[in-house]
Amino acid sequence: VIRILAVIAVIAVHVTADHLDSGSTVAMHVLRSLLSTAVPAFIMISGALNLAPSAMRHGSGRFLGRRLRRLVPATLVWTAFYAGVMGILLTGEPPDWRAEIVDLLTASTYPHLYFLPLILGLTVITPVITAYVGDSGRRAWICGAVAAGWALVVMAVPPLTQGLLQEPLVPLQMGILTYFLPFIGYYVLGRAAWAAPVRRRPALVLLLVAVPALTAATVWAYLSRTTDTPPGQVLLPTYVAPTVMLLSLALVVALMGLGRRWTVTARTERFLRTVGDATFGVFLVHFAILVGLRELGYPEVSVLTVTGLLVLVTLGAFAVSLLGKKVPGLRAIL
């Protein structure tokens, strides 16, 4: 369920991105803050599933073979589609090949494609992490916390040093080979939150106290001029900033703790599993549908029409993904 909600939230982020700025209402920034947890939640759910010992029951070779047979073709095809078709052919402008290559190497060809090298990197190191963590919830919590703390420190160095040195110190250059590194903490903590979930009372405290407080802090970070320039930019909400990271962890850990014992009927479980399995394809195709509707002149003049756009893109993306999974050629890239 969290995976389904997360991908819908990702779509909402991209639909509303052009309608949010510093002049937006506080309510819109509250929504923006909550939506910022979508990608971290998706990564945590992936970690909860992939780092389970049962995922390696046939060996790491089988695990990697199965995952990479899906991820590598999808990465190649969708990068070519968005960078080539959407980014070059449809724009009608002569490409700057040097800029295109730089965008490919830095995973910035399209707003959502960074996720592909990110999840590829996490998949490749999964057997190593699983070998250490095993079925120990305690090890998962410790390993995940260390990795998350490392990410916060490393990503904070550039804004903190920009005003002190002639040039900011950048210890980690984000690119297709390194994008996954700051997200290892989310990945492992997703496993920790499932293998050793917090008890009901702490989970309620997280959900009812920590999440609202951290949401308020994230809204402040969006609106405050403190985050416009270094060193205050260290608090600017990104997936690896203290505000969003703590909010994402509090929300997902609380939901996993509270929802661990929820049960549904077998029919509902089959439905949710089918829809959940389609979320990767939804993530990949939704941006093309969004751009297509905007190119056709879909009006975005009110909250109602923007909400309608969100519904259309979501339904369209799920339809394409679910139907595509029944077509042999498309199944491999969705």
Question: Residue spans of the language-model regions?
Answer:
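Functionally critical transmembrane alpha-helices in membrane proteins and complexes, commonly lining
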Residues: 1-53, 71-79, 109, 181
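Membrane-interface helix-boundary motifs at transmembrane edges
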Residues: 55-65, 129-140, 193-205, 260-270, ...
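Membrane-embedded alpha-helical segments of multi-pass membrane proteins
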Residues: 34-45, 108-109, 113-124, 177-188, ...
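Aromatic-anchored segments of alpha-helical transmembrane domains
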Residues: 8-15, 146-159, 210-224, 288
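Hydrophobic alpha-helical segments with transmembrane-like composition
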Residues: 86-90, 98-164, 173-195
